[in-house]
């Protein structure tokens, strides 16, 4: 047996897992500040949900989904993104009947079959938000501000915000016709994938990173010139709210995102040092998605951020997160009677909120002290038969080397004072 993880997956081990915990805890605090509540959905859904929600002509649905047939003959897919599942839950549980807006956040693994590379895996992790029940452009600005707040708390401020409006289905259809005509006149310059997209979904071509395609796209019609009055005013209002918050942004008329459900506002937060795959956050409005999935017309907006890519950006920037994997106390024991007593003290210390460890390998005092040093223990408590007989233990400050004796009867209270 080849004992290794499947290609495109990654074990997250200490101390790296501490970074993940810090990022997730930071995000949770900010979600709470913005009144977003956690939702947890299954990691697999019926395949039709993603076909209808994401769009059958998207790269995700056509090429990247992990789809299989279960023992009941049902087509099941591991979720490639989070929004469709949250929308399904919102509709299934009739949350739309409650007071709106409804604000959710989620954190969890997603799955896409694509070529593994820096910051991209076949099992990857996202944290994201979804807000339902309001078409207020102020909510669009809030979602963008929330994403920036997370990055700011993590120390990543050297980012750029890009926004666009891809309109409603009516004005987007007019634009799509004009774009298709233009692209057909330059079809010989398009890459193989874009030629295939031309008849299926020409807007996807705007997202192509191929150099020659980018040159063609540069002179293509701009969707902002085709917005209806309502969509134009909505986009102008979004910009005004961003201005009100002092958020700097750039309007990018080629920004369409890779999913079919987006309407009106689309945005990305980019960190240019990541190269071609520089988008950390991505999101936008999806006012037609609830109707596409469940025949209920309810506006929605959200974003997702890839945690692996976020950590890559933090590492590129040299940002050291304030994580701590050290412990407060390591109990060094001499003899079996002392070990039994120390085992109980270890439990009592933990119960009082102190992180504590004890030797489980029967090592010498010297080896136990080395182990205490490796764990980053702030203090060691040395307990042997003589300490039990005298009712006193030796406590050593591992930073200064200072040693003091304390009464075993007061051990917990005294250690609480020290740590």
Swiss-Prot record:
Q: Which Gene3D superfamilies match?
A: Anticodon-binding domain, Bira Bifunctional Protein, Domain 2
Record EC number = 6.1.1.21
Q: Which keywords does this Swiss-Prot/TrEMBL entry list?
A: Aminoacyl-tRNA synthetase, ATP-binding, Cytoplasm, Ligase, Nucleotide-binding, Protein biosynthesis
Species lineage: Bacteria, Bacillati, Bacillota, Clostridia, Halanaerobiales
Q: Say which enzyme class the record assigns.
A: ligase
Name the principal localization, coarsely classed: cytoplasm
Q: Which reaction does it catalyse?
A: tRNA(His) + L-histidine + ATP = L-histidyl-tRNA(His) + AMP + diphosphate + H(+)
Q: Per its UniProt record, what InterPro entries does this chain match?
A: aa-tRNA-synth_II, aa-tRNA-synth_II/BPL/LPL, Anticodon-bd, Anticodon-bd_dom_sf, His-tRNA-ligase, HisRS-like_core, HisRS/HisZ, HisRS_anticodon
Organism, scientific name: Halothermothrix orenii (strain H 168 / OCM 544 / DSM 9562)
- Any idea what this protein is called? Histidine--tRNA ligase
């Amino acid at each position: 047996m080849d004992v290794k993880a499947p290609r495109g997956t990654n074990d997250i081990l200490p101390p790296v897992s501490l970074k993940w915990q810090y990022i997730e805890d930071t995000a949770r605090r900010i979600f709470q500040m913005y009144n977003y509540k956690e939702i947890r959905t299954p990691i697999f859904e019926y395949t039709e949900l993603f076909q209808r929600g994401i769009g059958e002509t998207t790269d995700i649905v056509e090429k990247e989904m992990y789809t299989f047939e279960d023992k009941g003959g049902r087509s099941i897919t591991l979720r490639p993104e989070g929004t469709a599942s949250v929308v399904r839950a919102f509709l299934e549980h009739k949350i739309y009947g409650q007071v709106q807006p409804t604000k959710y956040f989620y954190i969890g693994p997603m799955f896409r079959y694509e070529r593994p590379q820096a910051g991209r895996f076949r099992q990857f992790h996202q944290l994201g938000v979804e807000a339902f029940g309001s078409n207020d452009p102020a909510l669009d600005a809030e979602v963008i501000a929330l994403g920036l707040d997370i990055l700011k708390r993590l120390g990543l401020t050297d980012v750029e915000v890009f926004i666009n409006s891809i309109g409603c289905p009516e004005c987007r259809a007019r634009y799509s016709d004009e774009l298709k005509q233009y692209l057909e006149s330059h079809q010989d310059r398009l890459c193989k994938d874009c030629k295939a997209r031309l008849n299926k979904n020409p807007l996807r071509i705007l997202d192509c990173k191929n150099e020659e395609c980018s040159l063609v796209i540069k002179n293509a019609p701009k969707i902002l010139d085709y917005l209806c009055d309502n969509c134009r005013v909505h986009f102008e209002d979004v910009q005004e709210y961003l201005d009100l918050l002092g958020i700097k942004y750039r309007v990018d008329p080629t920004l369409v995102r890779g999913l079919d459900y987006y309407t009106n506002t689309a945005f990305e937060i980019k960190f240019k040092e990541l190269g071609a795959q520089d988008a950390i956050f991505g999101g936008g409005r999806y006012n037609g998605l609830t109707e596409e999935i469940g025949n209920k017309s309810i506006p929605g907006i959200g974003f997702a951020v890839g945690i692996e890519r976020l950590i890559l950006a933090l590492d590129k920037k040299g940002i050291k997160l304030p994580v701590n994997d050290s412990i407060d106390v390591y109990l060094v024991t001499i003899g079996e009677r002392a070990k039994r007593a120390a085992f109980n003290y270890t439990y009592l210390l933990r119960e009082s909120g102190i992180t504590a460890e004890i030797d489980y390998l029967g090592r010498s005092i010297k080896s136990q002290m080395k182990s205490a040093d490796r764990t980053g223990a702030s203090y060691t408590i040395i307990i042997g038969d003589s300490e039990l007989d005298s009712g006193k233990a030796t406590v050593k400050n591992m930073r200064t080397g200072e040693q003091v004796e304390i009464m075993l009867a007061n051990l917990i209270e005294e250690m609480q004072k020290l740590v």
